[in-house]
Amino acid sequence: MKCVFVTVGTTSFDDLIACVSAPDSLQKIESLGYNRLILQIGRGTVVPEPFSTESFTLDVYRYKDSLKEDIQKADLVISHAGAGSCLETLEKGKPLVVVINEKLMNNHQLELAKQLHKEGHLFYCTCRVLTCPGQAKSIASAPGKCQDSAALTSTAFSGLDFGLLSGYLHKQALVTATHPTCTLLFPSCHAFFPLPLTPTLYKMHKGWKNYCSQKSLNEASMDEYLGSLGLFRKLTAKDASCLFRAISEQLFCSQVHHLEIRKACVSYMRENQQTFESYVEGSFEKYLERLGDPKESAGQLEIRALSLIYNRDFILYRFPGKPPTYVTDNGYEDKILLCYSSSGHYDSVYSKQFQSSAAVCQAVLYEILYKDVFVVDEEELKTAIKLFRSGSKKNRNNAVTGSEDAHTDYKSSNQNRMEEWGACYNAENIPEGYNKGTEETKSPENPSKMPFPYKVLKALDPEIYRNVEFDVWLDSRKELQKSDYMEYAGRQYYLGDKCQVCLESEGRYYNAHIQEVGNENNSVTVFIEELAEKHVVPLANLKPVTQVMSVPAWNAMPSRKGRGYQKMPGGYVPEIVISEMDIKQQKKMFKKIRGKEVYMTMAYGKGDPLLPPRLQHSMHYGHDPPMHYSQTAGNVMSNEHFHPQHPSPRQGRGYGMPRNSSRFINRHNMPGPKVDFYPGPGKRCCQSYDNFSYRSRSFRRSHRQMSCVNKESQYGFTPGNGQMPRGLEETITFYEVEEGDETAYPTLPNHGGPSTMVPATSGYCVGRRGHSSGKQTLNLEEGNGQSENGRYHEEYLYRAEPDYETSGVYSTTASTANLSLQDRKSCSMSPQDTVTSYNYPQKMMGNIAAVAASCANNVPAPVLSNGAAANQAISTTSVSSQNAIQPLFVSPPTHGRPVIASPSYPCHSAIPHAGASLPPPPPPPPPPPPPPPPPPPPPPPPPPPALDVGETSNLQPPPPLPPPPYSCDPSGSDLPQDTKVLQYYFNLGLQCYYHSYWHSMVYVPQMQQQLHVENYPVYTEPPLVDQTVPQCYSEVRREDGIQAEASANDTFPNADSSSVPHGAVYYPVMSDPYGQPPLPGFDSCLPVVPDYSCVPPWHPVGTAYGGSSQIHGAINPGPIGCIAPSPPASHYVPQGM
């Protein structure tokens, strides 16, 4: 049995007893589900007659020794404003309504009731009867809002729910849907608020700004329309529970009960299934199950159910300028006003006077909080409010750029206990008539004077109403947005990033922070520090923060707790990440210490995007192990598997990677080759090539560039003239090495005769288009000064690994006169011979028999053309590529250029160019004539000439066309179709052309030293069906037991006992039958030594077919050697499988 207890204490309060005991009040109490009313009348003259019926009981008495028992049994207490009664009731945790007796002297009860109400403990009112009852029926004041003091008559005040008193004031459970609408008992009582209100003082702002100034045109028009009606739209969290949040706020003065309201709605619809089932398509039970999910939105069917539950009719404002829609018309006096947008979102609609009253209440509450809880001096609060209102300047760009509010969020370092600064806040609730100074921003000259955060000052101001519920939701939403980003012009912008903003065309740039992303992802809301303003600006007006040093953007940020790297979405990191680091991290990155490796990638200038993630490598600093993150493979793999685990002898001077471990694992899980570069005697620099990135040993205190990547993403060494690259748009990657001594990496031994060091340029020299003189020169400043004349200060000798012997070097000289990789331009370079050496550690090669080779320029080398006709081949002087059905063997040379012998039997291939400083060696004996070729097909159009110097031709070939540039657009718009897979393989194909400028067919002379090897198996040649469709090659597969024998004896088992023939061996070119034909002017070519040091050279088996579109490489990626790579492609399967 639910009970209401009314007490007046020891005095008399006849007005209260008369109001409560009136017949209409008793009927109202009974209709609300209360079955008993207990009156403690004291010394009053009004004594109601007690009675008892089956449904209701009235008990009356004057005094008792103690009221604790009645208070404990009561579900609601209505009391006079005596201090003892109030405190005793609140101690029991009961909902309390205090009625003030205005006939007492000095009205001391009002002061006590005001203070307790400010602290949120109770509600209070008076018993005055209104002279204008018509105000009670006004729907302008939101029902259920005790704070609205304008017209809280019996009808309006009937919205006060007893469950509200229990849940809102004392955090008790909400009243169930069985008795949802408990109204106040006494019709003649009038709600009273302590501060008198002046209507002219609180004129609201026309067209309240939406949160972050991102209102749509329809929302702005709706706000203007509601303002003309004396209403305003209070924003509700934009989630699936917006309808239940709005109803909870209008019923219970808080949005925290939206989940209970949702559950009550589901329960009511389940109990009254016959009423609602006809409106639902499909299973009604499943519909209710989905409705119970907080992520499921609700509509008009739920509004009808809620109207029946809470005895409210719903009025919806849907279109600006049009009258509202009555969604329900059940005849209820109480109304709930909502605003419905086209996106299905619901907001609450209140009167402007409610907004004014709520602003005063909020200011009083925050004042009590800071004075009594945080013990802040009252004068300090007043000073802060005055400074908040007057200490700012006019917002000059408010109307143009959409500056959302007048104030900024300064965080005080000594206010950690206070709430954080709001990153984005709404000012839709600012009254029109309040101090115009608040439209201005705080003076940037001395912003540190603000003692409190902006949100606190906003809530302390009684003239501003802060939408706390919406602020809380917005903050939580922004936490989720931190993992998201938006992309513009190839650059990704994250919430909270620091940037520079231009407010006017060709105006100055201001430092700012990104606060919010626009609805259409074409604009952002930024907070400008200098102006202390928020502005909505297009993405075109943003640019990254300019660094003082030429410091590039880091590819990844290391995790503080772990040893790995954090995954960055999309593989790109904004350049402003560096600015967000603390001082220790910046010092650790920018300070170069001898022996440490610093990984960095120079970004494009003027906001251009970085290289795609597949061409970048992760940086590391500190003690984190260098690792590379593969976005395609989705895992992180270190190169420790391919290098010794013991430290280097000079590890004490640096803690980076081992000196000889500059390679990472590529996409096929194989280490790439290292290209050794010799700038001079006793000096060696390494550049490692793989499918991810190109890295070169960097210099110390020097500005000579060793390896560069121009902005077309084409790779090569710079000419050896000491000239620096111009422009930050050239993407460069370095890592630092320390100087060594002459014994760390000795010069290559000369076993067969004198060898000459070729001048220091690259076999892969790339003609680069000259930059305009207007571009700045790359300048990496270091603390210890710079080097004069761009020379190296130190001997770049790298200490050999203890368990690794110095491998042999395969050297070749390639002319760079006709190599032009620039897009749409030809490059003229001096015909200078260059040397590039591939260095393969002998231990990494496993148990592979190496063969030394020596090539002369007068020996004809067959070349496969990649011209337009796919089935044609270019015949050389004496050998045709179509004749290379089986490998041809010639006698080894007896004289000529000496071969450098090394423990790993290096192979040398030299093709001197005219004008080279090396004397031409004597030619070796010519190879035996090959078998007669098949009848050639009709001649194709003249293909581009091969790169062999000794080849002559009477026809003038057309100039070579440049290959297409690298794909660098992160959105993939420069690709044919695919944006992820195709971009990688497209660039990989181009890399193959840039990387493999070798002859299509080369010969390998037999070693002077007889090796203990077994014979190779003989494979039968499949019949040639069609030259346009090359057949699959066979390959030697590793079998169980055979590989172990081979690794132990340095031999390779064969199927027969026939010896390997002596002489030069001609290797065919492996073609890709599924690749596209390359551009004319570039021959598919093949290195003698494989690109991957862990895989041995393949023995020639099968036929080389002319006109192949692409080549695979030197070897098949089969499981040979010390690691097991990925299986070969489906179109390249050995015939023996």
Curated annotation (Swiss-Prot):
- Outcome of mutating A81T: Decreased N-acetylglucosaminyldiphosphodolichol N-acetylglucosaminyltransferase activity
The segment(s) forming the OTU domain are 231-352
Q: Which residues act catalytically here?
A: D239 (for deubiquitinase activity), C242 (nucleophile), H345 (for deubiquitinase activity)
Q: What is its EC number?
A: 2.4.1.141
Q: Which GO terms describe its biological process?
A: dolichol-linked oligosaccharide biosynthetic process; protein N-linked glycosylation; proteolysis
Q: What InterPro entries would the database entry show?
A: Alg13-like, Glyco_trans_28_C, OTU_ALG13, OTU_dom, Papain-like_cys_pep_sf, Tudor
Family that this chain belongs to = Belongs to the glycosyltransferase 28 family.
Associated disorder is: Developmental and epileptic encephalopathy 36: A form of epileptic encephalopathy, a heterogeneous group of severe early-onset epilepsies characterized by refractory seizures, neurodevelopmental impairment, and poor prognosis. Development is normal prior to seizure onset, after which cognitive and motor delays become apparent. Some DEE36 patients may present with an abnormal isoelectric focusing of serum transferrin, consistent with a diagnostic classification of congenital disorder of glycosylation type I.
What is this protein's record name? Answer: UDP-N-acetylglucosamine transferase subunit ALG13
Organism of origin is Homo sapiens (Human)
